Amino acid sequence: MARYRCCRSRSRCRRRRRRSYRRRRRCCRRRRRRVCCRRYVRCRRR
């Protein structure tokens, strides 16, 4: 599966949606690298 790289700063995730930014567009951590959650498809692919 393709992984999505998290935005440079966490503020970007919050900026997308203020209300449901916690559940849908939240920055996740995976294997040391910061990866965006599966729902956060706006991030760039890695």
Curated annotation (Swiss-Prot):
- What keywords are assigned to this protein? Chromosome, Developmental protein, Differentiation, DNA condensation, DNA-binding, Nucleosome core, Nucleus, Spermatogenesis
Q: Could you give a GO molecular-function term held by this entry?
A: DNA binding
Location relative to the cell = Nucleus; Chromosome
Q: What span is annotated as the signal peptide, if there is one?
A: none
Q: Name one GO biological process term.
A: chromosome condensation
Tissue pattern of expression reads: Testis.
* Database matches in InterPro entries: Protamine_P1
Which Gene Ontology CC terms are recorded?
Answer: nucleosome; nucleus
What the protein does? Protamines substitute for histones in the chromatin of sperm during the haploid phase of spermatogenesis. They compact sperm DNA into a highly condensed, stable and inactive complex.
Task: Write down what this protein is called.
Answer: Sperm protamine P1
| Organism expressing this protein natively | Glauconycteris beatrix
